[in-house]
Amino acid sequence: MKVKVAILGCSGRMGRNLIQAAHEHASIELVGGSVRTSSSFVDFDLGELAGIGAIGIKTSTTLAQLATADVFIDFTSIETTLENLTWCNENKKALVIGTTGFSDEQVQVIEQAGKTMSVILAPNTSVGVNLMFKLLQVTAKAIGDYTDIEIFEAHHRFKKDAPSGTAVKMGQVIADTLGRDLNKVAVYGREGITGERDRETIGFATVRAGDIVGEHTAFFADLGERLEITHKASSRMTFALGAMRAAFWLKDADAGFYDMQDVLGLKD
């Protein structure tokens, strides 16, 4: 049986990829997508919006118009996502969240919602990136206490948050594995005379340029050698296909707060 999916914020770069991925997925039935009431794409065909030709499904301006969906996929903004979370919880709908930049308090709100609804919070829905998280856990356990750890990320000029949600998640995975508090050991950029490096810190470096889809590298550096774990995305369709996989998995999930590690069966 196909899963009925609605795309929230479907007129953006990611939203258009999600439309195409959902329309072409054998196990997904695309039932609609939302845009803001002020959007120039109100009552617009989703297929035309995504550049794949008309598919006979028009954009909506409210979630209530998409109530036939089983699972909603949200790559909008922090404020909009939290509003959509409330609606989905009240209407017993599952939600895949790809929006990034949430504060710790906002993540707690999403986690709390997971007590009464099924929700996935995934700063990156790429299968490769989530395998990388697992590799980081293994690497940190083996050599994390003996190396200097730095995280580098690069994205397109239009990305609004920095460092990326994926980079923060990388740091969180490493810090948790090593028993460190990321809020205390994270260093976001360096300038001037910084002195010798504190061995327990985890550094973050950010690039915003051109049309870079997404690049992430974790460095585990010692004197004489270093290990680099890198993921590079060349197409947003990678994230869209991962989101479809998450939506299909979520349809049978009990109420809970999940991530892509659950979807891929990578949890210990």
From Swiss-Prot:
Catalytic residues as annotated in Swiss-Prot or TrEMBL: H155 (proton donor/acceptor), K159 (proton donor)
Enzyme class: oxidoreductase
Keyword NADP: yes
InterPro entries tied to this protein: DapB_C, DapB_N, DapB_N_CS, DHDPR_bac, NAD(P)-bd_dom_sf
Record PROSITE patterns: DAPB (PS01298)
GO cellular component terms given for this protein: cytosol
Compartment(s) where it occurs, according to its Swiss-Prot or TrEMBL record: Cytoplasm
Binding-site list for NAD(+): G9, C10, S11, G12, R13, M14, G98, T99, T100, A122, P123, N124, T125
Primary localisation category: cytoplasm
EC number: 1.17.1.8
GO biological process, one term: diaminopimelate biosynthetic process
Residue sites binding NADP(+) per the record: R36
GO molecular function: 4-hydroxy-tetrahydrodipicolinate reductase; NAD binding; NADP binding; oxidoreductase activity, acting on CH or CH2 groups, NAD or NADP as acceptor
Reaction catalyzed: (S)-2,3,4,5-tetrahydrodipicolinate + NAD(+) + H2O = (2S,4S)-4-hydroxy-2,3,4,5-tetrahydrodipicolinate + NADH + H(+); (S)-2,3,4,5-tetrahydrodipicolinate + NADP(+) + H2O = (2S,4S)-4-hydroxy-2,3,4,5-tetrahydrodipicolinate + NADPH + H(+)
HAMAP family the record matches: DapB
PANTHER family: 4-HYDROXY-TETRAHYDRODIPICOLINATE REDUCTASE 1, CHLOROPLASTIC-RELATED, DIHYDRODIPICOLINATE REDUCTASE
Family: Belongs to the DapB family.
Job description of the protein: Catalyzes the conversion of 4-hydroxy-tetrahydrodipicolinate (HTPA) to tetrahydrodipicolinate.
Protein name: 4-hydroxy-tetrahydrodipicolinate reductase
Protein's organism: Colwellia psychrerythraea (strain 34H / ATCC BAA-681)
